[in-house]
Structures are given as structure tokens and as C-alpha cells.
Amino acid sequence: MLKNDRLLRALRRDTVDRTPIWLMRQAGRYLPEYRAARQHAGSFLKMAKTPELACEITLQPLRRFPLDAAILFSDILMIPDAMGLELHFIEGEGPRLGKPIRDAAAITQLAVPDMETELRYVMDAVRLIRKELDNSVPLIGFSGSPWTLACYMIEGGSSKEYARIKAMAFNAPDVLHQLLNTVTDAVISYLAAQRAAGAQALQVFDTWGGILSPTMYRTFSLPYLTRIARELERGTGTEHTPLVLFGKGNGPYIAELAMSGTEAVGVDWTIELEDAARRSNGQVALQGNLDPATLYGTPNNIAREVQRTLDSYAAGNGGSREGHVFNLGHGMTPGMNPDHVSALVEAVQRLSRR
């Protein structure tokens, strides 16, 4: 039995003694111990593909901060890599795929990876982390969204314009839907395998959904998020594994996401939580949404923004703070001060106490 199940209870909108907190990219380059591990390992991929290293990095922030969850150390591009697109990282530039998708013929050759062979290192990491956590806090598994993964698979890496995938959306939408359906199958299998290996909550990162127009979002992102929420087996009762759909720029679609079948919606800092709570109409829990740049402020300013965020959620949720998981609106960045993270966690724990 979990010693700290605040996250899972909040995701079910049950009563908690205070608002739970975890942070996207809580294991990352802002921590000196992460930088030391990265230097010792020699590459990001070695860390991500070695279960013992992935476990160590997952646990690093838990040793520093009294967080309410661990999140698997990995990368959303492990699925495309396992599909044969050859993931590698270029220093200062980020991820690159050596064999990007350029036409329909390449899509027909894609297959859903076998999770216990091509992605066994991920599942072994999940099993090892669960063992090391010893039921102290829940472990979150994750995947990129179909749209976000397709962006990388077609562009070959990060992009400012996403011209190739947008051209495909306009000129060959059937081809893009074929890719998105295959990727959705892979995401569902991947999340199910993480759950079977021991993940106790799951999150989908729709990082690039916000680059789409409303019509395009409702065509190329939302239907596939909904399919994941409705088709991913998550169990019942005490064996239930809640799902969070997080997206940058998803504010206009919260009402629709709330009806997708997910347990929670994660939002960025470009919408007030009060508005998000009203739009979700009590159908889902909400996760977020402090602007990550707040952590560049003083501890007093951080505490002030924590209070404002907590109050904003309650104002849109009938005065109640239940059903809220405190998080940033996006991930931690390398230049952040770990002491300010401590101040953030302390402020959330103190100010959200029921």
C-alpha cells in the first residue's frame, strides 16, 4: 500500500489533506547530481536506455524535495526510436531522427514495437524504480501524444515552422491520419506496458498541440487523445491507473478534453486555472499551472504566485481545492535554482493545507 497516495486521490477528485505537487522535468539539468550523472554516463541515451541509470535519475529529485510523485526518467521519442527512426542527440540542438518519415511508403513500413523486446529497457526501469520507491510515492509513466510524436517523426527533430507536417496535413491528410493511427496504437500499447510494469499514473504530453489552429487541433490531435483515453485499459477500483492529458496551448479545448474519458487535464500557464476549472465543469481533475519562469523569482514571490494559483483553481471549482494537482505549466529549465524549487514545494505544502 502506498504511504503517500495524495496524487492518486487528487486525480480521482477525492479529499486530500493538502494539494499534491510534482514537477515536469523534476529530474533534469538544473540538479548538479543530474549533471554529474550525465557526465559519467557520457550520453543522454545511455542514461535513458540503462535501467539502473534511469532509476537513479528518477529518484534524484525525491531525495532533495518532499514531492508527491516520481516520474519515469525517459524521453517521448523512445517510441519513434523503437520504430526504427534512429534517435540521436546533437549537443546544443536536441533530438534528431536519422530516418524521418517523408512519404506514405515509409508509413506503411512502420509497426508497433514489441514492448518487452524493443522497449524492454523502459519496462525494466519502471520495475526497478517501483522496487526502489518501496511504495513511498506513486510512479508516473508517460508518452508523447500522437500529434507531437508525428511532428518529430516527419520533421526529423524540433522545428520553428513545422512546415513538413503542416504541408502533409493540408495536402495529404489521409496519409497523416494513417501515421497518427499507427502511432496511437503504439502509444496505447506503450502506456499499457508501463502500467503492467508498475506505473501507477500515466501522462500524455501533447507538447506541440498548441501550434495547430482550432480546426486542425480538432482534426489531428484531439481525436487521437480521445482514442487513447477511451481505449487504454486502466483498471477499476484500487487497481485503477489515472490518466493525465497535458498540452501546451490546450486552454481553448479543455471542455472537450474533459469529455474525452481522461481522469485529468494538465494545462500550461497561458490560461487562468479559474477559467480552466469552469470549462472542465468538475468532470476531471486539473494539473498545473505555475509559469516555470516564476522559479527565477525570490522565495517570497514564488509563495505569492503559489497562493494565487491555489486561489484561482478554487475560484473556478466552487471554492474547493479538491481535484487539483500542483505542477508547472511546462518543464523545469536548466538554469533554475534548486533552492527555489525547495521554496516552491514548501509553499505549496504550507499554503494548501486543509
Swiss-Prot record:
InterPro entries tied to this protein: UROD/MetE-like_sf, Uroporphyrinogen_deCO2ase_HemE, Uroporphyrinogen_deCOase
GO cellular component, as recorded: cytosol
Catalytic activity of the protein: uroporphyrinogen III + 4 H(+) = coproporphyrinogen III + 4 CO2
Coiled coil: none
Any GO molecular function: uroporphyrinogen decarboxylase activity
EC number(s) from the headed UniProt entry: 4.1.1.37
PROSITE patterns hit by this protein: UROD_1, UROD_2
One Pfam match: URO-D
GO biological process, any: protoporphyrinogen IX biosynthetic process from glutamate
SUPFAM superfamilies (UniProt xref): UROD/MetE-like
UniProt keyword terms in alphabetical order: Cytoplasm, Decarboxylase, Lyase, Porphyrin biosynthesis
Protein's pathway: Porphyrin-containing compound metabolism; protoporphyrin-IX biosynthesis; coproporphyrinogen-III from 5-aminolevulinate: step 4/4
Marked site positions, Transition state stabilizer: 75
EC top class named in words: lyase
Location in the cell: Cytoplasm
Main subcellular location of this protein, as a coarse class: cytoplasm
Residue sites binding substrate per the record: 25-29, 44, 75, 152, 207, 330
Record's subunit section: Homodimer.
NCBIfam families linked: hemE
Protein family: Belongs to the uroporphyrinogen decarboxylase family.
Function: Catalyzes the decarboxylation of four acetate groups of uroporphyrinogen-III to yield coproporphyrinogen-III.
Name of the molecule in the record: Uroporphyrinogen decarboxylase
Recorded name of the encoding gene: hemE
